Amino acid sequence: MKIDVIISADYIDSEALKGKIAVVIDMLRATSVITTALYNGAKKVIPVVSVEEAFEKAKELKSLGEEVLLGGERKALKIDGFDFSNSPLEYKREIVEGKNVIMSTTNGTRALNLCSKADKVIVASVLNGQAVAKYLENEEKEIVFVNSGTNGEFSSDDFMCAGYIISELCKNKEVELTDIAKTAKYVYESSEGIEEFIKDAKHYNILKNLGLEEDLKYCSTKNLIDLVFEFKNGEIKTVESGIKVKI
């Protein structure tokens, strides 16, 4: 198994992902939100690129009698007319269970849609990192960890999350790492902890300055969730893999 890392959404070559497994990360905060919403019983999450597309999709689903919630952000702030911002702590079970969540964010939902030509697209965060690693042990195709980044730029939080999952995967699977994948693994294994390492990251401090310290702490917590989620046909749902992940 070969493992590679893409450092931001701007570097995604959709055609080059054909035949590969893409593992999309937007640790702060889209993939943490998706992981949390589905764990708390959301029927599915539909990631879209634009705000206009989100409203159109919501209208379409509501016309079919579906319950819909809108979540997302622009410049880390809630979008006018949406039900939620991009804080995972808002997606509580009593609110999202059984409902469709349509999301649009600056970085994460864009990255997910750019990866749609991959053979499989897995949604990953620190929250379910060990579960993702365990799931990937059963794959033989090349795996590409796709860091969403921040506005097209490298983001150390996503890189750290990729390094963490790669490190977990290497414990039980013989893999071939590209230089950048080796670097991500090394950075994670040499650190004093995920949140401690990313405290100097630009995006981390944008969120901190908005008073979102609880989000940052939550998104940096390992293995709260033992489920794996796949983006397929425009929707994200829990993987029905039959694999029991013990955490």
Swiss-Prot record:
One Pfam family this sequence matches: 2-ph_phosp
Family per record: Belongs to the ComB family.
Reaction(s) this enzyme catalyzes, per UniProt: (2R)-O-phospho-3-sulfolactate + H2O = (2R)-3-sulfolactate + phosphate
UniProt-listed Enzyme Commission number(s): 3.1.3.71
Class of this enzyme: hydrolase
Cofactor(s) for this UniProt protein: Mg(2+)
Superkingdom as given in the UniProt entry: Bacteria
Protein name as catalogued: Probable 2-phosphosulfolactate phosphatase
